[in-house]
């Protein structure tokens, strides 16, 4: 593994919260915390933008992917819309997390709660090569379940 230095600014409403951190030695994602002033109650079916109190500057060639936490999804039906959310290297605003409650019960987001995870990833920029036909493949144009449902 290579450590990558990422510039981060703590915004005033998140200054007292810990920085995102990896929960275990081999974790790919860092946990993002809710920088809410007061608890936020998400009713079933509701979505809200939750602040993190952080702004970042990623190196060229990197993005940050904001992803749901599996425990919140399984136990409470809490997920992220626009998942994974992409934070581009040239974005300098606050990192926000769009939480959605797909569960049957209201869910309370409290200050400092781990609400999402952030994965830092390299990316490639593509250039289109317009051709008259595409090369053949075993799959062809089959999609949307065309490979079956059984292993």
Curated annotation (Swiss-Prot):
SUPFAM superfamilies attached to this UniProt entry: dUTPase-like
EC class of the enzyme, as a word: hydrolase
GO biological process: dUMP biosynthetic process; dUTP catabolic process
Keywords of this entry: Hydrolase, Magnesium, Metal-binding, Nucleotide metabolism
The organism's place on the tree of life at top rank: Bacteria
Gene Ontology terms for molecular function: dUTP diphosphatase activity; magnesium ion binding
Catalytic activity entry: dUTP + H2O = dUMP + diphosphate + H(+)
One Pfam family recorded for the sequence: dUTPase
Pathways involved: Pyrimidine metabolism; dUMP biosynthesis; dUMP from dCTP (dUTP route): step 2/2
EC numbers, comma separated: 3.6.1.23
Cofactor(s) this protein requires: Mg(2+)
Chain sites annotated for binding substrate: 69-71, 82, 86-88
Family, as annotated: Belongs to the dUTPase family.
HAMAP family on file: dUTPase_bact
Functional description taken from the UniProt entry: This enzyme is involved in nucleotide metabolism: it produces dUMP, the immediate precursor of thymidine nucleotides and it decreases the intracellular concentration of dUTP so that uracil cannot be incorporated into DNA.
Protein's name in the database: Deoxyuridine 5'-triphosphate nucleotidohydrolase
Naturally occurring in which organism (per UniProt): Rhodospirillum centenum (strain ATCC 51521 / SW)
